């Protein structure tokens, strides 16, 4: 689908918006431990991979795309923020198509962060139960090609999107749902 978008719109009209909570902090931590104990970074350490823009820059370079390239790190909403921005870029006429989505890997850094927030479940995840007691972490990736019109027969429609902040709590929205309603 990326190649179809390139053929239809050209490389300068395709953007990239990708999100990630943790951009390689685990690898950076290991590399810095090696530096302080052994006096040098491991030979396979790539400082560029630690940059906040790494995932979007990587995809842009892989496909030689010349459109806007943005990365998002807004915790759990990183991928959603990327998809929303992609939609806005298309609606504004900045891009004709945008590669959007996100990727996250399991890492001790993220696990410890959620554990310090007391957000990790003590048992199997039960998100829709009134007895839920937290989340279970995983890893994954999902990438979409959003475009101003159909590229192929597998096209879907993004019917709407929104973002808001209820300024309540990092992991617990207002119980009345007003933050979600505002979005």
Where are the predicted features?
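A glycine- and small-aliphatic-rich helix-loop capping segment at beta-alpha/alpha-beta transitions
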Residues: 29-41, 59, 89-92, 112-123
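Condensing-enzyme catalytic core mediating Claisen C-C bond formation in acyl metabolism
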Residues: 124-183
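Acidic, glycine-rich active-site loops and adjacent beta-strand->loop/helix elements
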Residues: 20-23, 74-78, 103-107, 162-166
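Active-site-proximal alpha-helical scaffold in enzymes
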Residues: 3, 52, 60-63, 69-102, ...
């Amino acid at each position: 689908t990326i190649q179809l978008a390139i053929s239809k719109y050209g490389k300068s009209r395709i953007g990239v918006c990708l999100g990630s909570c943790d951009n390689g902090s685990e690898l950076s931590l290991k590399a810095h431990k090696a530096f302080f104990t052994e006096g040098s970074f491991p030979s396979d350490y790539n400082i560029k991979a630690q940059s906040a823009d790494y995932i979007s820059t990587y995809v842009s370079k892989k496909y030689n795309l010349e459109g806007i390239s943005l990365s998002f790190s807004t915790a759990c909403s990183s991928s959603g923020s990327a998809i929303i921005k992609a939609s806005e870029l298309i609606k504004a006429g900045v891009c004709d198509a945008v590669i959007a989505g996100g990727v996250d890997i399991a890492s001790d850094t993220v696990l410890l962060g959620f554990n310090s927030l007391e957000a990790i479940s003590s048992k199997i995840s039960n998100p829709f139960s009134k007895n839920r007691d937290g989340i279970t972490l995983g890893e994954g990736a999902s990438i979409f090609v959003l475009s101003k019109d159909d590229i192929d027969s597998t096209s879907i429609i993004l019917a709407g999107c929104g973002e808001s902040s209820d300024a309540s709590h990092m992991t617990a929205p207002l119980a009345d749902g007003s933050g979600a309603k505002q979005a």
